[in-house]
Amino acid sequence: EVLTIDGKNAEVFNLLGVLKLQQNDVISAINWIEKAVEIKPDVYFYETLFQAYVRAGLFKQIVAREKEVLEKFPDNFSLLFNIALANKKTKNIKAAIKFYDKALKINPGSYLAWFNLSHLYSIEGETENAVSALKICKKIRPNDIDTDYFLSLALMRTKNYDKGLKLFETRLCRETATALQNKTYPNKATKETLWKGENIKNKTIYVYYEAGFGDVIMFSRYLPLLANRCGKLLFLPQKQLVPLFRDNPLGIDVVIDKYIPECDMNFDVHAPLLSLPYLLGLKGDKVFAYPEGYIRPNKELAEEFKKKYFNNDKIKVGIKWQGNTYYDQDRVIPTKFFKPLMAVENTQYYSFQTFEGSE
């Protein structure tokens, strides 16, 4: 009714957009708010419009309005934050860093701005800056698990393995793995029996997988070191990796390939696999146990695969283009980018992609 009287009432157009946002009709909301901005370029209208663009994933529209917004409102934190976010989402990393810096000069207490900035520093290989940003995050939210986890990774990238491995104990997959074992063996796999690095020379330790196949293969390098410290080593890998550890025992006494009832499961202490470098107290370069290699292929399988797939004189290249996007959206490489590589003469490419992304 107001618009029939005043067809250019920016406040009403913006209010209609806000109401549409509340109804999750984001595209209609954007149409209304864009009209409000055209009539009256008010800072509040721009803030609402950028929020709607973010909800719709229309980050290019934010970047397109970057210049006009900065000319009018160069010191608005909300607008600068969303411009930085839009550049981050559109892979314009250096611009994103610049705008997060500008936003933080206005509001230095923004956890999200520091957290996002730390991620961008990591992408750019500026690991010391990433650590500094995450330390500020930790001051803002001292008990935040995500901060501790990403700070652990950043510290290890700067080769500060002592502090990094300690904070790595906050990782979510550790909690998931120990909780699952506690549910499976409620009377034995308890918090009290978690191995804390103490002497277990004459004791049995039960180590179990966590995270993905690659993590288990990489961290299995610590099993021989653990075997030298304990009386007996039980290891539960993912079912698909059981044959690999049968061929490469790595000091394991029992590779568990099926469910064992609690009454038949005997161990003194237990630990998730990815905790081993920390629990073993490895320092400095000792973290990289067995750099010369510790996993060997099954000779019969290797010969079979050679005849079936690799019976050629070309340079053989295995590729994988996608990780688990539930945890990290940045571990995806569009397959089109491999095309120039495949044009190189005398090469043969093999897909190692499984599960998500294999389609």
Q: Can you annotate each of these PLM segments?
A:
Residues 1-359:
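Alpha-helical solenoid repeat scaffolds of the TPR/TPR-like class and their adjacent stem/linker regions
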